[in-house]
Amino acid sequence: MGTPSPKDDKGEPVRFHVNRDVFSEAVSFVVKLLPQRNPQPILAGVLIDATDAGLSLAAFDYEASARTTIEATVDEPGTILVHGRLLSDIASRLPNAPIQIEVDDDGGIVLTCGSARFTLASMPVQEYPAIPEVSGDSGLVPGDDFATSIAQVAFAASRDDVTPVLTGVQLEVTGTRLSLVATDRYRVALREIPWDGGSAASEESTAALVPARTLTEVGKTFSHGGDISIAFSGSGDREIIAFTSGNKTVTSLLIKGNFPPVRRLFPEGTDHHAVVNTAELAEAVRRVSLVLDRSAPLRFTFTTDGVTMDASGGEQARASETVDAHLIGDDVTLGLNPQYLLEALTAVKSEFVRITFTSSDNANKLSPVLITSQTSVDKAGADTFKYLLQPNLLLR
């Protein structure tokens, strides 16, 4: 979408009427992806384009953009740029009445709703960057499945910008499957969902490394919609991905770099595992870890009698609790980061969880545990969620 220039320094003589709730929701959506602090003030604006077809609202910070279209009665078409978060705050608190927005003779943006009246500064439209367009290959994914898969995977991405490739979620399309993968070196989360590439479907793989923060907002925004269209476009330093559902579109600049080949870390199969009730295990972990010092691992001992959690902290504080578990194989004692385990248990989305103990050719190296969903004690879950967690060394 281009950025038309205003007719003069005071801006275009725009005037339109719009439903309060529809407008408030649209503004809230487009400003959600903007950073709280932006070094370029112009990027704090929301671009509103009023035409005979209605309103188009957009926000862009050179890395991510959000766009939506809504119905409105437009008396005088034109384009305005106004501070986004301030407009969102105002719109969410307006009385239950239609909104009128117009540009006054001094170039200010006047918003009227019932007896409430606001005059906001007009930002220079001509200085706003062009919103990126995406016209590459695309496919469809079920909205609910995609939102769930993001919630199951994105939390495992790193929050440390020192290694940018680990702050993203790798989207990989192969045939009729879309995989989402994230890792911070200490854990790996993976989920697969159906992908409909339409007539352009191919067995060749397509990969895109999307910032986890942006993808998380996409999941929240599109969690209750229908199918989501995902399109890949661009090349070199301007590779982007677009997510569209209904009248909303989000684009994101992709992270440059090679995502580590973590899929090969998942074991082909092993019978050494334990099945535990997910909620019971999570509650016990929360209780016992209360006495742990920060970053200390929680000790887990798996036997045929159940799984026992032991913790000790400062000032001689200790805690222990046992939960029923169905163990196949030898007894196991290991240390796990309780927060990382709890995040996995939240992501599993099943009544029971299967904890598989992998093995390594290196006897001196701790092998990760594999966490998957389990419908019952003896029946695996239906989804394709997998989570690898690296154990911690335990002090004797």
Regions found by a protein language model. Name each.
Residues M1-R396:
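Structural preference for solvent-exposed beta-strand-turn elements
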